Each structure stands twice: as structure tokens, then as C-alpha cells.
């Protein structure tokens, strides 16, 4: 069966839209009136109060919408609403770095229902966004190449539908943890995929299986660039889910949203932070997260690393292929940006057991102390590790070394030093520091360039 609506056309429940393994139920989307898609415009001129737009040239021209700016649509997901703070917070961060038409798309009329129905209603949302983009183009001469659609959860697939309906002419779609149930493993027609825009970038933060882990996000790659921060499954600062018994996804409602969805919501928090940290989310190409954490994927290759989030489109090789996978670590709360460094320490002095820590000092900032090695400290041995600093130090000027040995009282007061410390940044730039001194336990040793 099918339903047809003015402006938007017809919607069927034929395969692959329904009646396939991933979507066994034959369900049609609700009417546009019931889904009630709304376009809430924020601009640099009205940062705190939106102007509600409709896809009508006179309404658009009488608003603060400007033809000489990019337009970024932000589409929320299941249970959510367009007036939720996170959408306008992304707009507010954007206003700090650019002039932009920032349109928060509200479809709470269609998102606050059972999940299976909501996953059909996004077809209407995608069609409404596509129609809006078509009106901009046909009535106002505004090119889809100035349009970027950002979608979270089900909103990612609504963005994909908008892109499919505009024949891939939209400049960019960003998927923030695209929803897994009813979408993972389905044909491209139904879900977000790289053909939906000229460039599609995706952040996966909740990619554990829905059963039994309740991971809402897809593990499947669906973009040109797919980022898996912290491995993509368990985000630092999110509690492990104790709802590991199987929950009927159609029975999840608002009270459990933050609790169930901490990992799932991290994706838009990372995006918001990335706007203000243009180099704080470098993603490293790597075979797996385990290989990445084993320090085998550093530094960035010669073409550089893409930045997860807002500046992913600056990566020269962004559309050289689909399903290009990248890994990185983030912080655990509010300031999520991190800068990865590799540090190698060549020891001198006595042979003892202990820990060695190093801190970095640069023209843009200083890092805290990071442990590089613990175990037997043997002169002339070199130990290396990588760490993710919450400070970008810039050009390195000096490093400081310290060691301690776990409260084992050693009456000989041994002295240990670092004859050489090498620091490598993610762009491959290497800095060497040397010292001929040794120090007692818990005494800082400063090494200068050599």
C-alpha cells in the first residue's frame, strides 16, 4: 500500500521500506501534518531566538536568512525535539567561527512515538528538508552546494533521505551516531549512505550491538569518512549500561533517555566541541581500535589526518573513497578535544625499579605529567609511549622528566636521568631534548633542545 501527499509525493510500504528482515512490520509514515516538521532559523543576527520558516520564498526573504552564507540544517532523533538546547548550542558555536544560516529542524510530532513508527516518519522529515532545499534553489537561486545537513540518530537517516531526494547535490551530510535498529544492513535507499551528498562524514559513538548492549548507533560504515572515537562503543565519562537485559525498543521512553543514551548523545557533544577546536580531533587511519591503542597508527600519514566533526571537510582526501575509517581518543567531560603525542625516553644513571613521567612545554601551552613507562629502569634503554594531552603545546621548547619508585625505601638514594627525550607530534614533526644530569627520586629534571 502507499500514501501520497501534496508537495512530497508518495510513500509505500514495499520492500525495502518495510517487509524486509531489518524491518518486518508493514508500517507507513504518518502524514506531514502529524509529523509537523518545523524549520527554526538562528543566525548571527538572532542567536537566541529563532525565526520559524516555511518553504515559501517570501517567508524566507523576510527573515534573517542570507543568500551569501552557508546553510546548516540540524535534525534531531528519536524522542528528541528541535528546541532542545544541544541543537541551538551547535548554532551558537558556529556563530563564533562563521556567518551562517543555522536551521534546527523540529519533528517532535513524529519522533515521540514507538521507535518503529518514528523510523518511518523520518521519510517525511527528509522529504520536507529536500523540498525546502528545492525551494531555495528554484525560487531564490540558492545552490544546494551551500547546504550542509547534520543529523543525530534517526535524524542522520532523515538527512540521508533529504540527500537522496535532491540527487546527491547537497554539499555535505554529517551523521552523528546514525541509528542502528531498522537501518543497519538495509539497502542504501533506506539509510544514510555516501551517495546522499557530495561528502558524507560520520561519527560513531554507540556502535555496540543493540542486543544485549543497547547500543543505539550503527557499527556499519555509511560515509566517505567514518570516525570511531574511543573505539566507537564505550565513551569515557559514560557509565557502562546496566540495562543489558533485552529491552523492547518500542518501549523506551523519555525517562531513560539520558541514562540509556549517554554514548549515543556524545556524538553531538563532540561535534559541538570540534567547531571551537579545529585541530583537536585528529582521526588516525588504522585497522582497528586495538591496533590504535597499541600505538601502531602514529603519526598521521603524509596527506595528514582528517579532523572528526566540523572540519572534516578540510581533509584533502575526503572523497577519495568510501568507508575510510579513523580512530582517536577524546576527553571524558566537557572539553573533549585531545592532542596525541609520542614520547621516547632514553635512560641514564642507576638501574632501579620505578615509574618515569614526562611533561611537555611549548609556545602554546604546557601539558601535565604523563607516565611513559614503569618497570626496570635500565641505563641506555629507550621506552616509548603515546598519550592524548588535553593541552595543545604547539612548538615544543623543553620537557621535564621525573621518576619515582613506589615508596620502596632505597637507602642508597639512587640517581636516574634521561640522556635523551624525543617528542613526536601527530603531524610527524620531531623534537629532541638532551641532558647529562641525573636526579634523585621525585626531583624534576629539565631537558633542553639538543
From Swiss-Prot:
Task performed by this protein = Plays an important role in fat metabolism. It preferentially splits the esters of long-chain fatty acids at positions 1 and 3, producing mainly 2-monoacylglycerol and free fatty acids, and shows considerably higher activity against insoluble emulsified substrates than against soluble ones.
Q: What class of enzyme is it?
A: hydrolase
| UniProt-listed SUPFAM superfamilies | alpha/beta-Hydrolases, Lipase/lipooxygenase domain (PLAT/LH2 domain)
Q: Which UniProt keywords apply?
A: Calcium, Disulfide bond, Glycoprotein, Hydrolase, Lipid degradation, Lipid metabolism, Metal-binding, Secreted
Answer yes or no on keyword Signal.
Answer: no
List residues traversing the bilayer: none
Where does it localize?
Secreted
Q: Which GO terms describe its biological process?
A: cholesterol homeostasis; fatty acid biosynthetic process; high-density lipoprotein particle remodeling; triglyceride catabolic process
How, per the record, is this protein's activity regulated? Answer: Inhibited by bile salts, is reactivated by (pro)colipase/CLPS.
- Similarity annotation: Belongs to the AB hydrolase superfamily. Lipase family.
> Where does this chain mainly localize?
secreted
How does this protein assemble? Forms a 1:1 stoichiometric complex with (pro)colipase/CLPS.
* One cellular component term from this protein's GO annotations in UniProt: extracellular space
Occurrences of domain PLAT (ranges): 339-450
Q: What is its EC number?
A: 3.1.1.3
Q: Which domain of life is it from?
A: Eukaryota
What name has this protein been given in UniProt? Pancreatic triacylglycerol lipase
Swiss-Prot/TrEMBL catalytic activity:
a triacylglycerol + H2O = a diacylglycerol + a fatty acid + H(+); 1,2,3-tributanoylglycerol + H2O = dibutanoylglycerol + butanoate + H(+); 1,2,3-tri-(9Z-octadecenoyl)-glycerol + H2O = di-(9Z)-octadecenoylglycerol + (9Z)-octadecenoate + H(+); all-trans-retinyl hexadecanoate + H2O = all-trans-retinol + hexadecanoate + H(+)
